[in-house]
Amino acid sequence: IKSSAASDVYKRQLYIRMKTLMEETLNNQADWVLFESYFNSTHQNFMDRLRQRYSDLTTGDLRICCLLRMNLSTKEIASLMNVSVRAIELRRYRLRKRLELEGDTNLVDFLMNF
């Protein structure tokens, strides 16, 4: 039980670090590499698995996937990425196409369970 509690604390600390990195900047490539490392360690290599299964995803697609997996809203993502809400809506639409999701499949649910 102690191990589980320690693991939860560790995951929480990593989450806080990731959020701090995102708030500072996600546009700097070095920061993105660090974010990716933290994200993969807390989400069972999510990005690696996603990249392996869907090799045509762009870096921007992967960023959106990570932010959606963190359960951020479209508005929050737009604010973090310094773009309009409409731009994120369009990226989500294109991402659904690249992931070949059915019309009734929720993008966030898909990413949470991936």
Each model region followed by its residue ranges:
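Single conserved hydrophobic/aromatic residue that forms the stacking wall/gate
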Residues: 1-6, 10
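Coiled-coil dimerization/phosphotransfer module
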Residues: 15-16
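Cytosolic nucleotide-binding catalytic cores of signal-transduction proteins
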Residues: 20, 25, 29-114
